[in-house]
UniProtKB/Swiss-Prot annotation:
It comes from Escherichia coli (strain K12). It is an enzyme of class 2 (transferase). Belongs to the transferase hexapeptide repeat family. The gene is maa. This is Maltose O-acetyltransferase. Catalyzes the CoA-dependent transfer of an acetyl group to maltose and other sugars. Acetylates glucose exclusively at the C6 position and maltose at the C6 position of the non-reducing end glucosyl moiety. Is able to acetylate maltooligosaccharides. Disulfide bonds: none annotated. PANTHER family: ACETYLTRANSFERASE C18B11.09C-RELATED, SIALIC ACID SYNTHASE-RELATED. Optimum pH is 7.8.
Amino acid sequence: MSTEKEKMIAGELYRSADETLSRDRLRARQLIHRYNHSLAEEHTLRQQILADLFGQVTEAYIEPTFRCDYGYNIFLGNNFFANFDCVMLDVCPIRIGDNCMLAPGVHIYTATHPIDPVARNSGAELGKPVTIGNNVWIGGRAVINPGVTIGDNVVVASGAVVTKDVPDNVVVGGNPARIIKKL
């Protein structure tokens, strides 16, 4: 039988009140608090906190404030930058390629809930992974919804709400996001 953590990461219905998951969220919040209250010149400390949070050494640059659920489901490529107020709800994996930039206030969600009200009211939750390719720029206050894959060389316009997969080499914008230009 799978643990609640295994079910969560696999995108199956799970119970977020599980003791292990509650402990993991608390750990992430403590690390994020330290990160968000560190000084800009404390580069080594910030990199160590991110390594502890993500479970991998990264040269990512993330402006405080940053928020996530667990951290261990976030996988960042080389040369990653996130500006102020980035949120990543990582109940399922979030994979971001090389040379990606997130403008202020970008939110990436893997967390979702059952559509059926009986299932939703039972406390069960689920998630869907998000994958973002290489050389992607996501504009300010854009939202990437659960289950979305964004291709390489994509620009997501400010304020876009991405609800469906995005192919390579395009600019998308709007709510819901649609292709507005091919690159």
